[in-house]
Amino acid sequence: MFLLAVGVMCLTACTQKKGGERGPRMGGGMSVNKDSDSTFVALKNETLKKFRQFTFEDAKTGKTMAYNLLVPEGYDGTKSYPLVLFMADASTVGKDVTAPLTQGYGALEFASDRDQKEHPSFVLVPQYTEWAVQDDWSTTDEVEMTIRLLEKVCKEYNVDTNRLYTTGQSMGGMMSFYFNITHPDLFAASLFVSSQWDTSKMQDFGKKHFFYIVAGGDQKASGGMRDLAKVLKENDARVDSASWSAKLPASEQEKLAEELIARGGNINFIKWEAGSVLPESGKGMEHMASFDYGYKIAAVRDWLFRQSKK
């Protein structure tokens, strides 16, 4: 038993990256139990029933992809609706199709009564069978399958293709960056949370509309933010940025976000002060702990829905 325990500890230590991130597939395999978060439990109870589960048969690869889809209540085929594509982190891969919904606030905030009343929209949440992207910028078939799934949904329903939004945390955020490079004209705006990508391919990102939110103590994601800021500056792009504690009252965070948005730029950075995303005990990894904070700010979500390609 002792040798087994030592082996497990060695395996865990060897898969930890600098800054507390787990392996090349950020957040890989781990998940956080949020049953003690009464606000999250209430949101989950309010929103899960709004999603239906389907399977996409991809003709190009012959593979299948399970996914969750929220169709706006009272959907009217004569009207067009925006769509949010949410992709979770690698802690959900290979699990039940609903795992990307139940892992945290991300998809559920867009499905909330509040958001659906303000912004009736489709919410598309794929489930992945494996880590879809790697830190060497390589991708699996499931990445482009996601785009073909999105195209399928847009054909089946009256989706406003001028108001498609991509967002994700960690692995999902990396995919969102990738889509902005490989499908530069597809999305009206993006929300990148706790993630990064190859900035050598981002010279034209100054023309895009996005929020980029990371934790100061998440070395990989905050490093990605720093590198992107440098590329944007080199290409004469404007970046509006702010930093505050994730422990501030929600009302104060909303006010700070609104002040950032009021500057009127198309690129907005938020960096949580180092350590502020962690629980009071100070234990945990800032990377995993930062995901939910990126989605709780209503002002950011409202800004996203105001963006349009027209």
Model-identified regions with their sequence ranges:
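Bacterial N-terminal signal peptides
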Residues: 2-10
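A domain-start/cap signature at the N-terminus of enzymes
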Residues: 14-83, 167-174, 228-230, 240-252, ...
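C-terminal catalytic histidine-bearing segment of alpha/beta-hydrolase fold enzymes
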Residues: 27, 216-222, 238-310
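Gly/Ser-rich "nucleophile elbow"/oxyanion-hole loop immediately N-terminal to the catalytic nucleophile
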Residues: 74-79, 132-170
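Active-site machinery of serine-nucleophile hydrolases
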Residues: 83, 87-147
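Alpha-helical scaffolding within the catalytic cores
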Residues: 101-114, 193-203, 253-256
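Primarily recognizes the serine-hydrolase "nucleophile elbow" in alpha/beta-hydrolase
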Residues: 151-156, 162-206
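Short beta-strand/loop motif that positions the catalytic acidic residue
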Residues: 211-214
